[in-house]
């Protein structure tokens, strides 16, 4: 048989709605490659729940390397430790060009904790990272062959004329991420509670969207019950329908302190919606959110600072509108055609 142009080893979810950042990034890149080269030229192995059928997974993985001209792997931090050594072993027999589509910003810390991984990473012909500071941090640690591949989405971007001055007294805020404590969801709740108290009434509501891990279901149920007057959880949104969901909101809250944060995909959703982002100054968030320009940055684990940032936008509607317009201007930078140009060139070498 003719060899596939590229084989991709990644997490594509369990067949339901795709919600976590790793699966969304891998799925979007794969779809764009299939659109450009045809599905018959792109081979895929899904690493989701591979432990349920390990023999079948290993065989498919081996065949992917054997039958592809170039092989890309898209692991997050846990998968890296399992899948990269396995890929290197299989590739010993075939010597394919290897690509690491890096998910998040975990690699610098992983190298610091496990310096032996540096040699393994330098066996890749190309590593595609999400932000310039991730690239710099990896280069400082001796990693080579680094390219840029930011997050990307093909969305129905709002028009500039849609961004009008919001004069409503009552506003809606949202959290649009995995619903877990290290994403700052409890800080967001506390901040909205504080903001309403300072405003002297129930003027701000908060909606959660995103994947809810089973280990957090009980805790979220408690939070929803305790804050029923202003808090709701709406489940998972299709990754290509985010603009339609986010349009009614005043701002997005992202008070994360998750250890593997890189380029959060929800920023691209906010850019295409023209939605101001209030985010923590954590890891690589400042690569995408410029304080006072297209969002506001706050310290981590600080509901009071988050409350102050919410009220800053609430009380200065012209600032809110300008930040929204600035965000909308950034959307074009994260369209698939612009983002994947270098990646396509590497594949076609």
Where are these regions (language model features)?
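Acidic donor-binding loop of glycosyltransferase active sites
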Residues: 247-261, 275
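Conserved acidic donor-binding segment of nucleotide-sugar-dependent glycosyltransferases
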Residues: 291-292, 296-303, 312-318, 332
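Glycosyltransferase donor-sugar binding loop
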Residues: 46, 204-218, 235
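A conserved mid-protein helix/loop that constitutes part of the nucleotide-sugar donor-binding site
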Residues: 24-28, 180-196, 261, 304
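Nucleotide-activated donor-binding/catalytic signature segment of Leloir-type glycosyltransferases, i.e.
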Residues: 218-243
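C-terminal alpha-helical cap of glycosyltransferases
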Residues: 159, 312, 333-349
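Conserved donor-binding/catalytic core segment of Leloir-type glycosyltransferases
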Residues: 7-9, 164-183, 188-194, 206-207
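Donor nucleotide-sugar binding/catalytic pocket of nucleotide-sugar-dependent glycosyltransferases
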Residues: 123-160
């Amino acid at each position: 048989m003719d060899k596939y142009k590229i084989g991709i080893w990644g997490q594509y979810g369990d067949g339901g709605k795709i919600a976590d950042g790793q699966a969304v990034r891998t799925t979007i890149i794969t779809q764009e490659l299939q659109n450009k080269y045809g599905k018959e030229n792109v081979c895929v192995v899904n690493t989701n729940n591979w432990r349920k059928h390990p023999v079948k997974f290993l065989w498919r993985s081996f065949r992917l390397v054997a039958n592809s001209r170039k092989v890309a792997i898209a692991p997050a931090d846990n998968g890296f430790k399992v899948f990269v050594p396995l890929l290197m072993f299989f590739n010993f027999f075939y010597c394919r060009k290897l690509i690491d589509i890096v998910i998040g910003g975990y690699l610098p810390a992983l190298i610091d904790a496990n310096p032996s991984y540096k040699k393994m990473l330098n066996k890749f012909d190309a590593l595609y990272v999400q932000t310039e500071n991730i690239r710099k941090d990896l280069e400082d640690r001796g990693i080579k062959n680094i390219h840029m591949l930011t997050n990307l989405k093909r969305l129905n971007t709002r028009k500039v004329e849609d961004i009008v001055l919001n004069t409503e007294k009552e506003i809606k805020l949202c959290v649009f991420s995995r619903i877990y404590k290290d994403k700052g969801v409890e800080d967001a709740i506390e901040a909205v509670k504080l903001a309403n108290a300072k405003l002297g009434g129930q003027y701000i509501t908060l909606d959660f969207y995103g994947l809810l891990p089973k280990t957090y279901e009980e805790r979220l149920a408690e939070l929803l019950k305790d804050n029923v007057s202003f808090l709701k959880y709406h489940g998972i949104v299709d990754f290509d329908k985010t603009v339609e969901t986010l349009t009614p909101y005043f701002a997005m809250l992202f008070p994360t302190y998750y250890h593997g944060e890189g380029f959060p995909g929800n920023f691209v959703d906010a850019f295409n919606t023209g939605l101001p982002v209030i985010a923590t100054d954590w890891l690589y968030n400042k690569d995408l959110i410029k304080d006072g320009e297209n969002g506001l940055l706050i310290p981590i684990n600080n509901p009071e600072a988050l409350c102050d940032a919410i009220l800053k936008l609430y009380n200065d509607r012209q600032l809110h509108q300008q930040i929204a317009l600035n965000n909308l201007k950034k959307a074009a930078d994260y369209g698939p055609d612009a983002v994947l140009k270098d990646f396509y060139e590497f594949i076609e070498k």
